[in-house]
């Protein structure tokens, strides 16, 4: 929120893309990031889990599941790239569809229509930090 407002205040929002990362695991998280002003999101862990779907069992019980997906992993040769690509594709497809459904439920047709006014929280501290509505506020 602060970065978005800073870019707008400096009148450079149209020249600099705001990319948000960290803690974005599911499409609901992605939508929140866009509502808070992100132009794009970077997902790390969730896509690694997606591409490793059903392959994460290969290194168990002696090695962690990540050993198949890391380029330097001890079991990188056991990773099926074709399956990983298919699982990643499905993750992106289902995430996009879930976001489309959520947008329709909010009466919106585009991510560009999202704003922080679409968000509400029951956490008073978060409401102040993110400058969004607080649900338990008495009127």
What are the residue ranges of the model-derived segments?
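Glycine-rich phosphate/ribose-binding loops and adjacent secondary-structure elements
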Residues: 1-74
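C-terminal extensions of enzymes
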Residues: 76-139
């Amino acid at each position: 929120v602060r970065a978005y407002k800073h870019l707008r205040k400096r009148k450079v929002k149209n020249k600099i893309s705001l990319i948000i990362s960290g803690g974005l695991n599911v499409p609901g998280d992605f939508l929140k990031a866009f509502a808070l002003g992100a132009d794009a999101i970077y997902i790390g862990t969730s896509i690694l889990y997606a591409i490793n779907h059903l392959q994460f069992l290969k290194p168990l019980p002696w090695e962690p599941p990540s050993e198949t997906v890391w380029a330097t992993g001890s079991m990188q040769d056991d990773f099926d790239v074709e399956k990983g690509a298919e699982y990643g594709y499905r993750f992106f497809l289902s995430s996009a569809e879930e976001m489309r459904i959520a947008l329709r439920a909010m009466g919106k047709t585009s991510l560009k229509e999202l704003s922080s006014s679409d968000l509400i929280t029951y956490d008073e501290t978060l409401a102040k930090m993110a400058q969004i509505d607080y649900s338990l506020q008495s009127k």
